[in-house]
Amino acid sequence: HLLKFNKMIKFETRKNAIPFYAFYGCYCGWGGRXXXXXXXXXCCFVHDCCYGKXXXXXXXWDLYPYXXXSGYLTCGKGTWCEEQICECDRVAAECLRRSLSTYKYGYMFYPDSRCRGPSETC
């Protein structure tokens, strides 16, 4: 669920998904193409692949239970789809935290027209 994913990103990075990640590079936000431009964009690419493997796009709107305590995110019990989407979001938020030192403000609001080259494959 996008609102829950935003909260996970905020918990891990102390940055709001909008504006910092919603349009970052070639893969953060809706869709994605070409090569992942930076470590944070790779986190978004892997997140897109995870969503693709886990469930249909409709599952991305499922509300899932999770907890943030003692510096860690944990997914709670839910339907199979909710648990899969929660794990995709949790892993991506942790990846974004690990890539904070390589965050490039020049990739914020990156235009799709600059996303060139062959697309990554999952």
UniProtKB/Swiss-Prot annotation:
SMART domains: PA2c
GO terms of biological process kind: arachidonate secretion; lipid catabolic process; negative regulation of T cell proliferation; phospholipid metabolic process
Amino-acid positions noted as binding Ca(2+) in the UniProt annotation, renumbered to this chain: 27, 29, 31, 48
Bound cofactor: record note: Binds 1 Ca(2+) ion.
Compartments reported by the entry: Secreted
Disulfide bonds: 26-115, 28-44, 43-95, 49-122, 50-88, 75-86
Active site (record annotation): 47, 89
Pfam families membership: Phospholip_A2_1
Cellular component GO terms, alphabetical: extracellular region
Family according to the record: Belongs to the phospholipase A2 family. Group II subfamily. D49 sub-subfamily.
Function: Snake venom phospholipase A2 (PLA2) that may display neurotoxic and myotoxic activities. May induce inflammatory edema by mechanisms involving mast cell activation and arachidonic acid metabolites. May increase plasma creatine kinase activity. PLA2 catalyzes the calcium-dependent hydrolysis of the 2-acyl groups in 3-sn-phosphoglycerides.
This protein's name: Basic phospholipase A2 LmTX-II
